[in-house]
Curated annotation (Swiss-Prot):
Entry's Gene Ontology BP terms: symbiont-mediated perturbation of host apoptosis; symbiont-mediated perturbation of host ubiquitin-like protein modification; symbiont-mediated suppression of host innate immune response; symbiont-mediated suppression of host PKR/eIFalpha signaling; symbiont-mediated suppression of host type I interferon-mediated signaling pathway
Phosphothreonine PTM positions: 494
Source organism (scientific name): Human adenovirus C serotype 2 (HAdV-2)
Pfam family, one: Adeno_E1B_55K_N
Record-given protein name: E1B 55 kDa protein
């Protein structure tokens, strides 16, 4: 992975020079000029166009297009000369009475050329890069120098990764790595990340095709020089696909930041975190598990999109889930520990059927709901505020304290209460017109089904016997008016 001297300005390898980029190195014939012909003036327009072509053939200077401002001008206007970008999309009708727009399909060659132009622009852009990661390591003679942050991420030299390069070696040597948008990368073996790094994908696609159980293992075991803005492992703007991969994409034992990363069609876990993890602006499409937060982990998941995932978020540690959107997910979030759930919008399945996956987190087997709060004898209820649920189901297990959702819209939502949790739910601060509340009375042992569980195994589930308790828990709006403080506005949050 030899890299040219970053101080030398010029065209990167694999690209043409400026002359060939601008003019192609060849003289191309310009396409035929498109001429506006107003109705009733075809003779003059044809004569003018013919005169221009004849003058061009004779070697004389072409005449300037005559035009008059305003929509009523009857002179000929050569639009292609005024706007060259319209040459390919404007044609003249057969009768010559007007113009017709032609919609051109975007071919693969045009998309490739656009990606190459974007890559050329990114690689030739001037940046204040003055030092390499190896030079920073050489300057650190002792542990005190390792702790001092003398440089920032902007000053670190970027290495542009080629499709044939080794991911692990490039991250170890250069730390700041960028991917080319016009290339497709392939991961064929496990990538161990043992130092802080900053990977900018620029929208490039990375296909994972390996038989290993993990694609990226983030485990920093050594001390590395500190760089301001490069805290842990940072990965941004990368599209991951893995149609033939059945393992975990990211297994993080160190600080991990995923910014604007997309995951497409993974039949296993996308992100499994055992420590601090921040997932921001990511998208999960048709994945089995999106983000799994193991015990003692701290996760921040915000502004993400979950679409058609079996299990979006599994929280076994301390999680903060804010400003996310979920659509057609079997279970958006399974809460086994404490969590903060705010400002999320969740739409349930379009089909009128429940999820067939179980959870055995509290020792009992229950069907996973769209938002599932598992029972825990020592944990408090999650903070549940400013969420919008549509065609969803909410499972509430037994916990300490009172579950008090604040300003949540439960539209066409079913709430399932376990036997001990009915007296611990207060729904005075929700929009409750179309919600339904059911309480589990007992479990019928004569009606059992064997279902797959989120733990990876299969369990037998007893069918619950439920009772409709909607009116028992719905507040009396003739006594508790909607103008009270639960739905009011403060100085910080005005209507």
């Amino acid at each position: 992975m030899e890299r040219r001297n970053p101080s030398e300005r010029g065209v990167p390898a694999g690209f043409s020079g400026h002359a060939s980029v601008e003019s192609g190195g060849e003289t191309q014939e310009s396409p035929a000029t498109v001429v506006f012909r107003p109705p009733g003036n075809n003779t003059d327009g044809g004569a003018t166009a013919g005169g221009s072509q004849a003058a061009a053939a004779a070697g004389a200077e072409p005449m300037e297009p005559e035009s008059r401002p305003g929509p009523s001008g009857m002179n000929v206007v050569q639009v292609a000369e005024l706007f060259p970008e319209l040459r390919r999309i404007l044609t003249i009708n057969e009768d010559g009475q007007g113009l017709k727009g032609v919609k051109r399909e975007r071919g693969a060659s045009e998309a490739t050329e656009e990606a190459r132009n974007l890559t050329f622009s990114l690689m030739t852009r001037h940046r204040p890069e003055c030092v390499t990661f190896q030079q920073i390591k050489d300057n650190c003679a002792n542990e005190l120098d390792l702790l001092a942050q003398k440089y920032s991420i902007e000053q670190l030299t970027t290495y542009w990764l080629q499709p044939g390069d080794d991911f692990e070696e490039a991250i170890r040597v250069y730390a700041k790595v960028a991917l080319r948008p016009d290339c497709k990368y392939k991961i064929s073996k496990l990538v161990n990340i043992r130092n802080c790094c900053y990977i900018s994908g620029n929208g490039a696609e990375v296909e994972i095709d390996t038989e290993d159980r993990v694609a990226f293992r983030c485990s920093m075991i050594n001390m590395w020089p500190g760089v301001l803005g490069m805290d842990g492992v940072v990965i941004m703007n990368v599209r991951f696909t893995g149609p033939n991969f059945s393992g975990t994409v990211f297994l993080a034992n160190t600080n991990l930041i995923l910014h604007g990363v997309s995951f497409y069609g993974f039949n296993n876990t996308c992100v499994e975190a055992w420590t601090d993890v921040r997932v921001r602006g990511c998208a999960f499409y048709c994945c089995w598990k999106g983000v799994v937060c193991r015990p003692k982990s701290r996760a921040s998941i915000k502004k993400c999109l979950f679409e058609r995932c079996t299990l979006g978020i599994l929280s076994e540690g301390n999680s903060r889930v804010r400003h996310n959107v979920a659509s057609d997910c079997g279970c958006f979030m399974l809460v086994k520990s404490v969590a903060v759930i705010k400002h999320n919008m969740v739409c349930g399945n379009c089909e009128d059927r429940a999820s067939q996956m179980l959870t055995c987190s509290d020792g009992n087997c229950h069907l996973l709901k769209t938002i599932h709060v598992a029972s825990h004898s020592r944990k408090a209820w999650p903070v549940f505020e400013h969420n919008i649920l549509t065609r969803c189901s909410l499972h509430l297990g037994n916990r300490r304290g009172v579950f008090l959702p604040y300003q949540c819209n439960l539209s066409h939502t079913k709430i399932l209460l376990e036997p001990e949790s009915m007296s611990k739910v207060n729904l005075n601060g929700v929009f409750d017109m179309t919600m339904k509340i059911w309480k589990v009375l007992r479990y019928d042992e004569t009606r059992t089904r064997c279902r797959p569980c989120e733990c990876g195994g299969k369990h037998i589930r007893n069918q619950p016997v439920m009772l409709d308790v909607t009116e028992e828990l719905r507040p009396d709006h003739l006594v508790l008016a909607c103008t009270r403080a639960e739905f009011g506005s403060s100085d910080e949050d005005t209507d």
